[in-house]
């Protein structure tokens, strides 16, 4: 059983059902692997192995008594901005370094009820602000494909843990590309659902109108297994939409993959996604993937979308503005980090926030506060909201010509740790992904090749509520290619 970490969720569920191994053996295998190798990756902030092993034993007992939940006893892990009762929830920040949540996020509760066993909490950029996972108070995460390189962010710990074979699937959150970009950098699959599809209750907020929880897995099918229990209406979340979700797993398993399975499907490609800044090797992999989609029956059509430079500017006005508001609650009084021996209330506020927040979070709070200030609110924030509406309209027009839009996920492969210290350069990594968040659309990234030995991801974007279409389309591609099965040296 030395290669259990190579198995898909589907294979793990079958193995448990057929008694090829127990949940306890499975959790023990992954825990031992994490203890042995995560020193090189730093993907976990909190290892909750004792509780996981207890849950695995319970899962085995329940299965023996006839509990037939297919995912009962399958391991996974959570991004550390999802509240977990009795377990540290830090959001990668000194501000919450010792915060133990008194309740579970709805997502955490739903996943546990489906039978999954959580192994712990995964590293992330502080308060989900970053694209490389170098801003975490708990140290940078390393990419399993090259431990000298970044895994992407902000869900870098989640992506790295799946790519390293520490867990078969993991949760993440995506505000401007924080699932899709690390999925691309780490050579795995990741999906951001439609805004409102998955509950945000219990997810520590960065930008409330943009944040959405999603999943990582080796394949589209693995992502579907974890997304299925997460999706659905939650009355505790005011942004949750009361709309039935599809049976993602059943839809994929019923999909025909032989012949020309994508016949009749139109995939839109915009010239704006292939401009300056796109690495030539990345573009080569993307073009090859699009040709494969054509071979599978899809028709490639040209569409127009908002200039990515405009979406980038819009996002970096709106997201920091919302962050400025959301993070004002961390004042050293109610919860979170509190400075020592404050001279007065003003000193308590000032020092607690300046000592508790890292440089990138402080930068975005300042940017957001400036955009919201009385003299600039209309010139910046209000105008950005109007542009956001136009971005939504442009996507609607594009989808009149196609079923799915394809683009590179990131303009480059993973870069070296510490290499891109200029914040503006890091912000540019989100250039292809942020428009999706501004429009509230679902999108997925799946691996389609390599650039200089590093993974490259293709982004697929669909209409609102069409997660199943995305997953089925990626599954068809993955049924005819093996890029999603490529393994980093750490995993072989």
From Swiss-Prot:
- Mention one GO molecular function: glutaminyl-tRNA synthase (glutamine-hydrolyzing) activity
Q: Give the matching InterPro entries.
A: Amidase (IPR000120), Amidase_CS (IPR020556), Amidase_dom (IPR023631), AS_sf (IPR036928), GatA (IPR004412)
Instruction: Give the catalytic activity.
Output: L-glutamyl-tRNA(Gln) + L-glutamine + ATP + H2O = L-glutaminyl-tRNA(Gln) + L-glutamate + ADP + phosphate + H(+)
Residues annotated as catalytic: 79 (charge relay system), 154 (charge relay system), 178 (acyl-ester intermediate)
Gene Ontology cellular-component terms for this entry are: glutamyl-tRNA(Gln) amidotransferase complex
- Judging by the UniProt lineage, the source's domain of life is Bacteria
Q: What is the E.C. number?
A: 6.3.5.7
Listed A to Z, the keywords are: ATP-binding, Ligase, Nucleotide-binding, Protein biosynthesis
Q: Does the keyword NAD apply?
A: no
GO terms for biological process, alphabetical: translation
According to its UniProt entry, the function of this protein is described as:
Allows the formation of correctly charged Gln-tRNA(Gln) through the transamidation of misacylated Glu-tRNA(Gln) in organisms which lack glutaminyl-tRNA synthetase. The reaction takes place in the presence of glutamine and ATP through an activated gamma-phospho-Glu-tRNA(Gln).
Family matches, as NCBIfam families: gatA
Q: Which family does it belong to?
A: Belongs to the amidase family. GatA subfamily.
Q: How does it assemble?
A: Heterotrimer of A, B and C subunits.
Protein name as annotated? Glutamyl-tRNA(Gln) amidotransferase subunit A
State the organism named in the record.
Answer: Moraxella catarrhalis (Branhamella catarrhalis)
Q: Its encoding gene is what?
A: gatA
